[in-house]
A protein has these predicted regions:
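Active-site-proximal loop->helix
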Residues: 73-85, 103-107, 111, 129
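Short gly/ser/thr-rich secondary-structure transition/capping motifs
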Residues: 86, 123-128, 168-175
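Alpha-helical segments flanking ligand/cofactor-binding loops in enzyme cores
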Residues: 54, 79-80, 155, 159, ...
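Conserved phosphate/ATP/ADP-binding segment of small-molecule kinases
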Residues: 158-232
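Conserved phosphate-binding/catalytic loop of the ribokinase/pfkB sugar-kinase fold
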Residues: 90-95, 105-142, 147
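Beta-strand->loop->alpha-helix junctions that form or flank phosphate-binding loops
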Residues: 15, 40, 66-71, 89-100, ...
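Glycine-rich phosphate/adenosyl-contacting loop at the front of the ribokinase-like
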Residues: 6-68, 73-87
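Short, small-residue-biased leader/transition segments that mark boundaries at the very start
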Residues: 1-5
Length: 232
């Protein structure tokens, strides 16, 4: 029975960023030029790609993460964490010239945060790296992507995935201008209201405008459009 279960595990490839989140909690966030004495400090794996990969692996999928790290302590620690989460790290490449990505996050007592991301090696994930992982794209059931790695790399991977008849799920964040040729390779897209407005040209202010924006985005050749509205 266990063999049957293993065969039924969905194979998911995630193409995206991996960062180390460095988080400090404080009573309030500092204003420019101010120093605030904080409380708790901790480090977590972060980056939209790594977050998706960890979540999918914990839900029982067979996950491969395609990403890039620097040859440094943060990168090596990230690899250990991904392996402990049963993620295939075979295609996490190392950039000898760039540091691993980090995010500096300050959080106040209400949960409001301010974040600065230094993407580092994530920004050098290339089309050549995707070529090295083509066999995994061909085996995959689903390919997850976001836009914290170069858009030309993601678009190249989406084109290959479509040629293999694979379902591409795109989280179009950070908000960016995307070509119709790229969007036509996407099966499911998950924009927030700002990203939906950028993709559709329709300002999303309520449920009715969200429906209109979703319809306009769907007309670009995307089968499923899911617009997230935050706390609404």
């Amino acid at each position: 029975a266990s063999d049957v279960y293993k065969r039924q595990k969905p194979k998911i490839v995630v193409i995206g960023s991996c960062n180390t989140d460095m988080v400090v909690k404080a009573g309030r966030l500092p204003v420019p030029g101010e120093t605030v004495l904080g409380g708790t400090f901790y480090m977590n794996p972060g980056g939209k790609g790594a977050n998706q990969a960890i979540a999918a692996a914990r839900l029982g999928a067979e996950v491969t993460l395609i990403s890039k790290i620097g040859y440094d302590l943060f990168g090596l620690q990230a690899l250990e964490i991904y392996r402990s989460e049963k993620i295939n790290t075979e295609f996490i490449f190392t950039d000898q010239k760039s540091p691993s990505g980090v995010a500096l996050i300050s959080v106040d007592s209400y949960g409001e945060n301010s974040i600065i991301v230094a993407p580092g090696a994530s920004r050098s994930l290339s089309t050549e790296d995707i070529d090295k992982a083509k066999s995994k794209l061909e085996e995959a059931d689903i390919i997850l992507m976001q836009l914290e790695v170069p858009i030309e790399t993601v678009e190249y991977a989406a084109t290959i995935a479509k040629s293999y008849g694979k379902k591409v799920i795109l989280n179009p964040a950070p908000a960016s201008v995307l070509s119709n040729s790229f969007l036509s390779c996407v099966h499911t897209i998950l924009p927030n209201r700002i990203e939906a407005e950028m993709l559709s040209g329709i300002k999303v202010i309520d449920e009715e405008s969200a429906w209109r924006a979703a319809k306009a985005i769907g007309e670009k050749g995307i089968e499923n459009v899911v617009i997230t509205l935050g706390k609404d």
